Amino acid sequence: MQNQKIRIRLKAFDYKLIDQSALEIVETAKRTGAVVKGPVPLPTSIERFDVLRSPHVNKSSRDQFEIRTHRRLMDIMDPTDKTVDALMKLDLPAGVDVEIKL
């Protein structure tokens, strides 16, 4: 696998989980001899919801809820076969969504 790169995008609602997962991926890739660029923090998307507190009147009284989606981006340059095998065997937490592009 010469002159290739693996691009890894992580998504999670909890920033501690995503940072821990990114650190595991970086350590695994460096242990197998690959060069890692990142993790680069991408903008956090915030989705807000306004809900009426009362079922009948008082429209001016509302609750506000939000979901924050944290994202990270990493590039693994010149990966070896060992790197790919180690990344496939890596066990990440359930709250982290991983996208891998070769």
UniProtKB/Swiss-Prot annotation:
Belongs to the universal ribosomal protein uS10 family. One of its GO terms (cellular component) is ribosome. HAMAP family: Ribosomal_uS10. Part of the 30S ribosomal subunit. The gene is rpsJ. This is Small ribosomal subunit protein uS10. It holds the Pfam family Ribosomal_S10. It comes from Thiobacillus denitrificans (strain ATCC 25259 / T1). Involved in the binding of tRNA to the ribosomes. InterPro entries: Ribosomal_uS10, Ribosomal_uS10_CS, Ribosomal_uS10_dom, Ribosomal_uS10_dom_sf. GO terms for molecular function: structural constituent of ribosome; tRNA binding. SUPFAM superfamilies: Ribosomal protein S10. Transmembrane segments: none annotated. Keywords: Ribonucleoprotein, Ribosomal protein. GO terms for biological process: translation. Disulfide bonds: none annotated.
